[in-house]
């Protein structure tokens, strides 16, 4: 079985999720396929998780690629951990509303910042879903772990029609 992580360069999210999955016996003999646009982060997360696999003497395997289609090829599960625009865009999500007197506690899921974030993420989420339908297992399951959570999930299910 293969699990593909889109945005695997989100080191904290990816490492935590994989460590949790590796605690489940059914997921210990699996292929984790990591995709990210940052080769540097991709290499780092792959090395960290490979070390976890080796230290625990598990049969899990790792693939890594900056080619999303390659990572999605044959995947049964796809986990989205992306932050479209990175931290620089997130800063704008906070600061632009603040210029107009809208002080939001967090700008990644609610209020004006969440809407801005959604406008960046939804088109890319829909692109991911099209690739999932083309390259992944026929009954693949898309698991969104990226904010704005509700907006991305809604787009994937209602517009892109993925599981």
Which sequence ranges carry the predicted segments?
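N-terminal Rossmann-like dinucleotide-binding module
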Residues: 3-32
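Gly/Ser/Thr-rich loops at beta-strand to alpha-helix junctions
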Residues: 8-13, 39-41, 122, 144-152
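Short acidic, glycine/serine/threonine-rich loops at helix termini
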Residues: 16, 44, 90-92, 153-158
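Short, surface-exposed basic-aromatic patches at helix termini and helix-loop junctions that form
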Residues: 23-26, 50-55, 80, 134, ...
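Rossmann-like NAD(P)-binding element
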Residues: 35-41, 56-135
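Rossmann-like dinucleotide-binding core of oxidoreductases
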Residues: 126-163
């Amino acid at each position: 079985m293969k699990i593909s992580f889109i945005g695997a360069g989100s080191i904290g999210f990816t490492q935590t999720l994989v460590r949790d999955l590796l605690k489940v016996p059914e997921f210990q003999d699996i292929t984790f396929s990591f995709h990210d646009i940052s080769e540097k982060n991709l290499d780092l997360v792959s090395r960290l998780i490979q070390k976890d696999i080796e230290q625990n003497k598990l049969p899990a395997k790792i693939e890594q690629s900056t080619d999303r289609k390659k990572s999605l090829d044959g995947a049964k599960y796809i986990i989205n951990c992306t932050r479209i625009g990175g931290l620089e865009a997130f800063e704008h999500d906070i600061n632009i509303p603040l210029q107009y007197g809208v002080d939001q506690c967090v700008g990644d899921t609610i209020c004006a910042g969440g809407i801005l974030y959604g406008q960046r993420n939804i088109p890319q989420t829909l692109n991911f879903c099209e690739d999932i339908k083309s390259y992944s297992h026929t009954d693949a399951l898309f698991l969104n772990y990226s904010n704005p959570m509700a907006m991305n999930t809604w787009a994937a299910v209602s517009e892109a029609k993925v599981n």
